[in-house]
Amino acid sequence: MTSTPQRIASIAQSLDGDVQLATALCSATSLAEVGTIARAAVRQRLRCAGVTFVLRDGDQCFYADEDSIAPLWAGQRFPITECVSGWAMLHGKLAVIDDIEQDERVPTAAYRSTYVKSMVVVPIGGPDGPAAAIGAYWPATYQASRADLDWLPRLAQATSGAIADIGLADAPWAPNFRTRFPASAH
């Protein structure tokens, strides 16, 4: 992986000048580290109550990790067609849900035992399509700012580049994820 000053500056510019975040993503050496960096950035920027890092594994979504005020779904798998992270990956679009009770994409039964009332999920992936997602969650109905909704896809792109650079040898539980990220273009 090449962490040239020019590359870091380019990524930092796309992340509203956040050189520290760009440097951390460019320096990451494992998928777990990339997930930790991305989750921390989202939680800090969006001031949300929880963040998940989700990987696509064939027709399943694997909730690889989370940083949350209460447990959500870390370590669990769900059919890709039955969760919002899966919807974001399948459609390659940001899922913005101000009120989970009012959005048909939300499998409300999965949320009844959680604090989640609002969420935003951004897909992460290369040209072959998204193979990961980051979800941000709030305990009340919430509308994310336009600036934050514009920033999330840029973070997803930088995260995708970091994943492409490190490879996925440390992700044996997600064999289909491994082939989804070609070498980084940045």
Predicted regions and their residues:
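Acidic/proline- and glycine-rich, intrinsically disordered low-complexity segments
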Residues: 72-94
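Short beta-strand-to-loop transition segments that serve as allosteric relay/switch motifs
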Residues: 69, 133-143
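Signal-transmission linkers at sensory-effector interfaces
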Residues: 1-32, 44, 162-186
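Flexible loop/coil segments at beta-strand boundaries within sensory signal-transduction domains
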Residues: 125-130, 139, 166
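Signal-transducing coupling segments at domain and membrane junctions
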Residues: 62, 70-73, 98-118, 138, ...
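GAF sensory/regulatory domain recognition
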Residues: 39-43, 50-76
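A short, aliphatic-rich beta-strand micro-motif
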Residues: 117-126
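Amphipathic alpha-helical "output/dimerization" segments
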Residues: 144-164, 176-178
